[in-house]
């Protein structure tokens, strides 16, 4: 597994998680 692929997947996961958190607060 390429480490850059992991980093990209992690960024997407974090961004998606942040959207859910902001949505629940709003």
Curated annotation (Swiss-Prot):
Q: What is its EC number?
A: 3.2.1.52
Question: Which reactions does this protein catalyse?
Answer: Hydrolysis of terminal non-reducing N-acetyl-D-hexosamine residues in N-acetyl-beta-D-hexosaminides
Temperature-activity profile: Optimum temperature is 50 degrees Celsius toward pNP-GlcNAc and 60 degrees Celsius toward pNP-GalNAc. Displays activity higher than 50% between 35-70 degrees Celsius. Stable under 30 degrees Celsius.
Recorded effect of pH on activity = Optimum pH is 5.0 with pNP-GlcNAc and 4.0 with pNP-GalNAc. Half maximal activity observed at pH 3.0 and 6.5 with pNP-GlcNAc and at pH 2.5 and 5.5 with pNP-GalNAc. Retains over 90% of its activity between pH 6.5-8.0 with pNP-GlcNAc, and between pH 6.0-7.5 with pNP-GalNAc.
Which pairs of positions does the record mark as disulfide bonds? none
Query: Which named protein is this?
Result: Beta-hexosaminidase
Q: Name one GO molecular function term.
A: beta-N-acetylhexosaminidase activity
Keywords of the record, alphabetical order, are: Glycoprotein, Glycosidase, Hydrolase
- Tissues where this protein is expressed: Detected in dry seeds and cotyledons.
Summarizing activity control, the record says: Inhibited by AgNO(3) at a concentration of 0.1 mM. Strongly inhibited by CdCl(2), ZnCl(2) and FeCl(3) and moderately by CoCl(2), CuSO(4) and NiCl(2) at 10 mM concentration. CaCl(2), MgCl(2), MnSO(4) and KI also have a slight inhibitory effect of 20%-25% at 10 mM concentration. Activated to a small extent by MgCl(2) at 0.1 mM concentration but inhibited with increasing concentration. Not affected by carbohydrates such as fucose, galactose and glucose but displays a slight decrease in activity up to 25% with lactose, alpha-mannose and N-acetyl-galactosamine (GalNAc).
């Amino acid at each position: 597994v390429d480490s850059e692929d992991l980093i990209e997947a992690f960024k997407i996961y974090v961004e998606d998680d942040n959207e859910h958190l902001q949505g629940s607060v709003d």
